[in-house]
Amino acid sequence: MDKKQALDVVHNLRKVAKQRKFVQAIDLVVNLQDLDFKKPEHQIDFYVTMPYSSGKKKFIGALVDADLFEEAKSVCDIVIPLHQFDDYKDKKKAKKLAKRTDFFIAQSNIMTKIAATFGRTLGPKNKMPNPKAGCVVAPKTSLKPLYDKLQKTIRVLARNKPILQLCIAREDMTDEQVADNLYAVYDQLIHHLPKERNNVKSVFLKTTMSQPVKVEV
């Protein structure tokens, strides 16, 4: 798929997607093939920073100590300082935090304490602070660039089933913006598959309520 093909697909989607009383998400659906998920090298897990946000604001949390507290407080949506970690040994409170938060930024020198407190809750939900997304940072780091980057970042994850469904845009974005995000995600996916395009069975683009439009790849 090149950028022109991506734009053509978006145009086709516009033709079939009916207007609703709400702004619909636009999802990329990829069916994979010839992958053995028992092999670690066949498990798909990476992050893509798209050219544009998907249109949905990401809720960003920070797990820090005094070194980053003021910086995190000025940038992130919720900040849990080290001295409050014990409060989140309450499973209900920890689960509520995990549910509302898309990404967690963590201070690197307290990762052991973060893992001990939050690992059992965030780990199964794939929300532990992840170095692959740049979410584990040194003390005194400026967080605004990372916060802005995470607003455009999605996780591509397939460990058990050979299908991906990723929210890459909203219908109120321009065709060019949607196409740029589509191309960026697909291009990165191809380069993370062991057999590249040969691991792709089919690709579709759809809005929340529309029928899927096939992408020729």
Question: What is each model feature region?
Answer:
Residues 64, 168-170, 207-209, 217:
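Flexible glycine-/small-residue-rich
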Residues 72, 123, 205:
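Residue-level signature of catalytic and energy-coupling elements of molecular machines
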Residues 75-81:
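Active-site regions of enzymes building and remodeling cell-envelope glycoconjugates
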Residues 16-70, 90-91:
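Translation machinery proteins
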Residues 27, 58-61, 78, 102-105, ...:
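Structural motif
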Residues 8-16:
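Interdomain regulatory linker/hinge segments that flank or connect interaction modules
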Residues 82-184, 188:
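Long, charge-patterned amphipathic alpha-helical coiled-coil/hairpin "stalk" segments used as oligomerization
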Residues 20-25, 192-204:
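Flexible, glycine/charged-enriched surface loops at secondary-structure junctions
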